[in-house]
Amino acid sequence: MPRYPFRRFGFGALRRLLYLWVRSETINQSAFTLKIDRSKPVLYVLQQPSVSDLAVVDTECRKAGLPRPVMPVAVGDAIEPAAFFYLTPEPDWLGRQDKRGASPTLVRMLAAVGQNGLDDAQIIPVSVFWGQSPDSESSPWKLLFADNWAVTGRLRKLARILILGRKTRVQFSAPIHLRELVEQGKGHERTLRMVNRILRVHFRNLKTAVIGPDLSHRRNLVKGLLRAPLVRQAISEECESERISQEKAEGIALRYANEIASDFSYPVIRFLEVILSWFWNKLYEGVKVNHIERVQDVAQGNEIVYVPCHRSHIDYLLLSYLLFRNGLTPPHIAAGINLNMPVIGSILRRGGAFFMRRSFKGNQLYTAVFNEYLHTLFSRGFSTEYFVEGGRSRTGRMLHPRTGMLAITLRSFLRDSRRPIVFVPVYIGYERVLEGRTYLGELRGATKKKESIFDLFKVVGALKQRFGQVWVNFGEPIHLDQFLDRHQPDWQDQDLGPEYRPDWLPQTTNLLAKDVARHLNDAAAINPVNLVALALLSTSRQALDESALARILDLYLALLRQVPYSPSATLPDGDGQALIEYVKSMNLLAEQKDALGRILYLDEQNAVLATYYRNNVLHVFALPALIASFFQSNSRISREQLLRFARALYPYLQAELFIRWSLDELDAVIDQWLAALVEQGLLRQENDTFIRPAPSSRQYVLLILLARSVTQTLQRFYMAIALLLNAGQNALTAEELENLCTVMAQRLSILHGLNAPEFFDKSLFRHFIQTLLDLRVLRKDETGKLSYHELLGELAEGAAKRVLPAEIRLSIRQVALERPAEEAAAESNDAATN
C-alpha cells in the first residue's frame, strides 16, 4: 500500500507505467458531479484490493480535482496516511484474508465520528470496470476477459488490463455521511456492521447494473454440498471402506464437487451469444423457433428441466443461446467429462455446463456429491438441461433413452416436491448437421468413436457448403407431479426411505423416459431435406424423375396437412417443386438430363447421409406407410383385417420409433389416415373394403413409395422372427439371436445391394428382442434361452405376410434355413469378437 512517501513514489511510477497503455474515463461524468464538503474528511472505498484499480482511481481524481486517495487525510487530530480503504481487507503476509473483518481505516473513522467528536466523514464508493459493459461489447475476445463476479487472479488481471485497458471506466458514487449513520444510536459495533452491509449491497447492485447479474452459484454451493446429510454419510462410509482420514475424504468430495459444478458468467454468456449469432447467421441461415411460449408459460414458479434431442455438439449451446435471446434464464447443462478440456472446458463451464462422468458405478462418494448437486439445482429453482439419449444420435433416430438422469431427477423430487418440476422437450432439426461427414463412417458400419468436441474442427474444410436452417421446436411440457399422480397415485403418502428409492422407481422412470422420447418426436420439425431423403430412399436406386419426386413431396405435405402428426410438429413452406429447388441449392442432389427430362438422384455418399435425415422424421410417416404396406401384396383388404394386422405390428413400430398414439387410439387414427389416402386418390373405398389403384397408375407408384418407407424396418422384424422359428424353442439366447440377426442382415444387404448400414444395426435388433420380451411374446428360461408364444407364428404368417412382398419373405426364409442355427451363431459371435 502506498501509505508512506517512498511507497507513494513507487506507486506514482507504477501509475505512469500503467498509463502508457491504459485509457480511463468516469461513467456519466460521476467524478465531476460529486457533492462533497471539502471541509470534512473524504475517503474512498474500493471493493477488492487492487493496485491497478487504485492507480486508475487516483488518476481520475486528479483529472476531476478531487482529493487524491493516496495522499494523507486529516481526521480530527489524527492523520490517516492514505485516503482510501478496501471493503474486503488486504491479505496478511501469508496471503490469508479475513473476509468477515472490517477495514481498520473504517473502524478508526467511525470511532472518530461516534466517540471522538469529529463532525462528519464522507465515504465515497468507487468501482473500476475494465472494458465496456458486456451488453455493449461486440468483440468475442474482449468478452472472454470482461469483468465478472469471480475473484480474479494476478495473471488474468494482467490479461484484462492488456486486452481491455483502453476502455477502462470508473464509477464514483454519492458519498455516505457517517454522521447520519452514527446518529441512529445503534452503538459502534452495530453501526460498523451496518456500514459494511450498505457498502456490500451498493457494490453488488452497481456491478449487476454494469456487467449483468451474478449467475454463478458455485462459490456458495460447492462447500455447502459437503454439509448435506447424504454426502456426510457417504464421506463417513468412504473413510471406513478406504481407511482414510475424515479430512482426506472431505478433500476427495470437494474435488468431485469442483469437477462437477458449473460457474455461470454473464460475460461468457454474452461472448457465446456474439459468437453464436455470427455462427447461426453465417454458417447456417438462421434458427427458426416454434412454441417458445410454452416455456414462458411454465417458467414462473416451476423448476424447468429442458430435455432436447441430441444431434450435434452445438446442441449444448444452441438452447442457451435461444433462451437468452428470448429473455429466459439459460439452463445448467449436463455435459460429458470428456468435454472438460483446457480452455474449451472453462468456456463451457462458465456458459453453464456441469460435468459428469460416464459411469458412477462403484464410486458411492462421487454418486452422493453428484446427486446432491442436482438436488440443489432443482430445489433452488435453477433450470437445467440434459440429453435423455445420452450421446449424439449417429443415425438420426431418437435413441432409446438412458434413465440415469431421469432417475436422479425423480428421486430429488420425491425428496422435496415443494417446487414443481416440469420437463420441456426440445426438438432440434438440422437441414445439414455439422458433423455429418464424421458420422458417415459410422453410418457405413464403422466402430463408434469416442465423442470429442474436436469433431467440430474436423469439418472446417466443409464449411463452404450450404448448411441451410436450424429448426427448434419446444414440445408439450410434462409436469412431473401430474405424471406421478397418473402412475403412482399415492406417491405423496408413501414412506420412501432415507434414500428416496421406492420399489416402483425403475419402472416409473422407464415410463417417464418413453413419455419424454414421444414428446420429443411429437415436436418434429419436418424440413425439405427430410422429405426429399424419405422419398428418394424409398426407390430401388435412390433416383426419381423430377416431376415424380415433386408429386410424392406434394403427397407427403398434403397427407400431413390433412392428418397432422401432432400440434407440436411443423412443416416447411412451399410445394414439392419448391422443396426440390431448395435441396438442390444445398448440393445434396445429383442431376442427369435426358430427352425426357431430369432425373434427380443421391450419389453414394449422400445416399448414406440421407438415411440420417430420413430417420429424423420416419416416425411421422410410419403409420401411413404401414397402412400402405398392406397393399404391396394385396389388391384389396377389409377394414377389419387391416385393423387386426395393424394392431399386431404397431407395438413394435411404436417401441422402435416412439410413435405418439397408444393402442387404444390406433383404430381412430388409422381411420383418419385411410380417409386421407382415399382423398388423395391412393386408395378407393367400397363399403368396408379398401382397394389399391391399378399398378400402371401414378397413384399406385406413390402408394408403393410411401409403403417402402418402413419396408426395411418390417424386414428386420421378420428376420428375427424367422430365425427364432427356425431355431425352435429354447435354442437361442437373446445375445445369440441378436448376433444372428446382424449377420443375416449384412448378408441380405449384400445380396440385394442395400446401401443402408443401419439395416444391420445391432441396437435395433436388441431393442426389438426386448420389446418381444416386454410384450411376453418371448420368455427366458433359467439358462437365458428364449421360448416363444404361438403369437410369434401368427405374427410371421399373418401380419408379416400381409405387409412384406413374397420375394422378400422368401429371401429371408432361405437365408435363415441355409445353415444350422448353432453354426451361424458361432460365426456371428466370432464376427462380434473380431
UniProtKB/Swiss-Prot annotation:
Membrane topology: Peripheral membrane protein
Catalytic reaction equation(s): sn-glycerol 3-phosphate + an acyl-CoA = a 1-acyl-sn-glycero-3-phosphate + CoA
Principal location listed in the UniProt entry: membrane
Superkingdom of the organism of origin: Bacteria
Family: Belongs to the GPAT/DAPAT family.
Pathway: Phospholipid metabolism; CDP-diacylglycerol biosynthesis; CDP-diacylglycerol from sn-glycerol 3-phosphate: step 1/3
Database matches in PANTHER family: DIHYDROXYACETONE PHOSPHATE ACYLTRANSFERASE, GLYCEROL-3-PHOSPHATE ACYLTRANSFERASE
Keywords recorded for this protein, A-Z: Acyltransferase, Cell inner membrane, Cell membrane, Lipid biosynthesis, Lipid metabolism, Membrane, Phospholipid biosynthesis, Phospholipid metabolism, Transferase
Location of this chain's protein in the cell: Cell inner membrane
Any Gene Ontology biological process: fatty acid metabolic process
Record comment regarding domains: The HXXXXD motif is essential for acyltransferase activity and may constitute the binding site for the phosphate moiety of the glycerol-3-phosphate.
Protein name: Glycerol-3-phosphate acyltransferase
Cellular component terms per the entry's GO annotation: plasma membrane
Motif (HXXXXD motif): 309-314
NCBIfam families the record matches: plsB, PRK04974.1
GO molecular function: glycerol-3-phosphate O-acyltransferase activity
InterPro entries (UniProt xref): GPAT/DHAPAT, GPAT/DHAPAT_C, GPAT/DHAPAT_LPLAT, GPAT_PlsB, Plipid/glycerol_acylTrfase
EC number: 2.3.1.15
